[in-house]
Amino acid sequence: MKFFALFIQRPVATTLLTLAITLSGIIGFSLLPVSPLPQVDYPVIMVSASMPGADPETMASSVATPLERALGRIAGVNEMTSTSSLGSTRIILQFDLNRDINGAARDVQAALNAAQSLLPSGMPSRPTYRKMNPSDAPIMIMTLTSDTFSQGQLYDYASTKLAQKIAQTEGVSDVTVGGSSLPAVRVELNPSALFNQGVSLDAVRQAISAANVRRPQGSVDAAETHWQVQANDEIKTAEGYRPLIVHYNNGSPVRLQDVANVIDSVQDVRNAGMSAGQPAVLLVISREPGANIIATVDRIRAELPALRASIPASIQLNIAQDRSPTIRASLDEVERSLVIAVALVILVVFIFLRSGRATLIPAVAVPVSLIGTFAAMYLCGFSLNNLSLMALTIATGFVVDDAIVVLENISRHLEAGVKPKVAALRGVREVGFTVLSMSISLVAVFIPLLLMAGLPGRLFREFAVTLSVAIGISLVISLTLTPMMCAWLLRSHPKGQQQRIRGFGKVLLAIQQGYGRSLNWALSHTRWVMVVLLSTIALNVWLYISIPKTFFPEQDTGRMMGFIQADQSISFQSMQQKLKDFMQIVGADPAVDSVTGFTGGSRTNSGSMFISLKPLSERQETAQQVITRLRGKLAKEPGANLFLSSVQDIRVGGRHSNAAYQFTLLADDLAALREWEPKVRAALAKLPQLADVNSDQQDKGAEMALTYDRETMARLGIDVSEANALLNNAFGQRQISTIYQPLNQYKVVMEVAPEYTQDVSSLDKMFVINSNGQSIPLSYFAKWQPANAPLAVNHQGLSAASTISFNLPDGGSLSEATAAVERAMTELGVPSTVRGAFAGTAQVFQETLKSQLWLIMAAIATVYIVLGILYESYVHPLTILSTLPSAGVGALLALELFDAPFSLIALIGIMLLIGIVKKNAIMMVDFALDAQRNGNISAREAIFQASLLRFRPIIMTTLAALFGALPLVLSSGDGAELRQPLGITIVGGLVVSQLLTLYTTPVIYLYFDRLRNRFSKQPLMKLE
């Protein structure tokens, strides 16, 4: 009593407290970073190792396996996958979410050091690692194009100047340059000329390496002068290498230009990027964890004039993809929904109270509660994102509830003629415990969510904390500011508004009287009401089992990724043309704004495309509909497939795949895996629940298999290492020397001329010079024939692995897809030696699916415990929780009606409903218990009076929550696919629960009262 009186009697202090909350919230809002979703930092580390020219099987056995054995001993590794391809190995280590990434990095470095002695000596550099976050897509992609500069020169400008400057921008963590490689001097050997001159390829390599060295020459101290000694020991251009003497033939010098074409080119000629139909170099920019995406993009754009000024005018630097516009638009839509929700909620209050002064009270309480939440968000390290702003939108209906309950009860006393201050004190005292119970039990719903492990727990932690803080601030405001404003603003018997109140009151009174008559019938026919309640429980079970489920709503971020997979034996030149053809098809679609792509590197039969769609206001189709439309056109391209998927803000797992979802086959026997993978893939491709089924198993690449005749080699004085060196020198793009420049280092690359690398008959022209100086053709001691060879070797853990990727067809659900895959595996009869498991997002979905019911039950149990403590009763919490089945039915029916799958967003909606719908029961039960304790009346009369007395605040709070969620249901534009499931779930649950709980709660109250009387004759205990 004294607590409430303190704030009513000290309006200045109460006002200043409110202003302090508001000011801190405004400051917090200005400091909050912006992102599409809460930051989930996956502790993922990628280890890279290279050995140019080595085939995938060699990389897997000699590089990947030793590294995997060392890295697999690190504590906290959840998953280890590796891909070994031509000349490179990439190992992805995914750690437990609770693992510190910096500590994990130290352990990785220690493991790499321990494995160094087990690695081949021919590796040009030690394995490296870098930290990465697979769920964080690039925030911007830039392209460099020019009509006058070569690809290598563009790459040099990009990596030497632009990448360095962009990386220094606040918020940027990494800038990756792609689409070409650094400039290099390429020595393109002519095998015929070498044979005629009697010069081996290895002799050329040694001569070049010896001619280009960078060593200190020292200094000379004369009597008066200190002289530095500097020699011309380096050759830095192709022109300088051409006259280099590599051999003497009968006393005549053989120069490099006599046996090779020496040109200024690039390190890797099998690497190409394209943008807008012309060759391009790509700059892929990523942000730091937790950085404000919009602010970071704005800083980069502000640097554009300086970046363009740092490169020649004939080089065009353009932005090909910008992640920020859709984020801006999505957050603008959420903020608009928030403002509309506040306005609708206040309108509900005005319609019921018909008083400008009374409406002013929640009009102040709601914004203060929401604004104050921003301060707590900043202190917790949260961001402004779709989920946190959705939490505030939903909170609008919650925070006004407390104010409505207090305001409505005080207004009831004022209408009875009680003086304002007395009415305020009496009114807040009567409902103080009710408001406290409502708020605490609502926050209790989120306790299991806060303790939830894994991705869902991390993802929705901000949502739960933001909503809980808003409710907590609302509780404080409703018990301090609201009664103070009522005492000083409202008047008893406002005669000027009497008629208006009576006019609307007639409608409300008629509804209330009709409710009273129907409630009286329900209390007389309790068995029928119980049948309805039990039916809703059964209907909940059936609807939950039958409704399609997915992990997260399919987002339309305005960005798509394309992955090209061509015939495994395709040449790089043909692959470039495929990339160009696919880019033309995609770019011609009316919904597409820009297309950027690249191909090459360690996999010559694959390529990637970054696709930006036009803003939603300029296109009619969703991203998924655009993909569906393009599938038919892309299928006409022979010899290659392009798999398109919409870029999502949530991506799980570090493995690369051509589609959104993965199913991995594991086997200890590689032969068994290669036998069953095509069968499984073919079976999955026939499933209508899946689309774009493809595999990363590529074991049909064209290989020229050489067989050495070791006896002949021994007789000719040739060992295997010399023969292998010949092949590496000829076809391995071997980096044989380094050119040092002030800003960068460049390589001298040697191989045979392109006309020889593109023709397998070139093997006939290869030769080795033995110890006797004789030129021995390769064909003398080796035979070769075409064969199949893997383009990549994949491991998971230490097992051979093959990942089958798939997308969902338009309108498909992940639950139907995973169930279909499991049925197909069972029907195929796959042996136990080949194990199948979902990976990435599909794996997390299955784990989440198993825990959903437990999470809901934990939330219900937590609320029961809290209510039991508050009411000092085992029974009354059950009465209150009896409202939940009807809410569940309404939510699931609404999802079915809107053809929306049950996702994590819908699950959060169900959790919210657990907190929302019980408020009606709390208001009924509180007043019924008070009437029984103090009025000495029967349970039936008490609950009947309580239901009628609290009818107006029940309708008001329900409508407030409903109108708070309605903008989410009706939302459109960017991010609507995230907001709508939450709004649909809440609105559907509220509508059905409102219709049913007005009858089921009183009936359950009577049943439990009879049960209490049967086992205990003690009167109800008064709670002070």
Curated annotation (Swiss-Prot):
Transmembrane intervals: 12-32, 333-353, 360-380, 387-407, 435-455, 469-489, 528-548, 853-873, 875-895, 897-917, 953-973, 984-1004
Protein name as catalogued: Multidrug resistance protein MdtC
Main location: membrane
Keyword set, alphabetical order: Cell inner membrane, Cell membrane, Membrane, Transmembrane, Transmembrane helix, Transport
Annotated Gene Ontology cellular component terms: plasma membrane
Family annotation (InterPro entries): AcrB_DN_DC_subdom, Acrflvin-R, Multidrug-R_MdtC
Keyword Cell inner membrane belongs to the record: yes
Subunit structure: Part of a tripartite efflux system composed of MdtA, MdtB and MdtC. MdtC forms a heteromultimer with MdtB.
Compartment list: Cell inner membrane
Membrane topology label: Multi-pass membrane protein
Species annotation: Yersinia pestis bv. Antiqua (strain Angola)
Lineage: Bacteria, Pseudomonadati, Pseudomonadota, Gammaproteobacteria, Enterobacterales
A Pfam family assignment: ACR_tran
Family to which the UniProt record says this protein belongs: Belongs to the resistance-nodulation-cell division (RND) (TC 2.A.6) family. MdtC subfamily.
Gene Ontology MF, one: xenobiotic transmembrane transporter activity
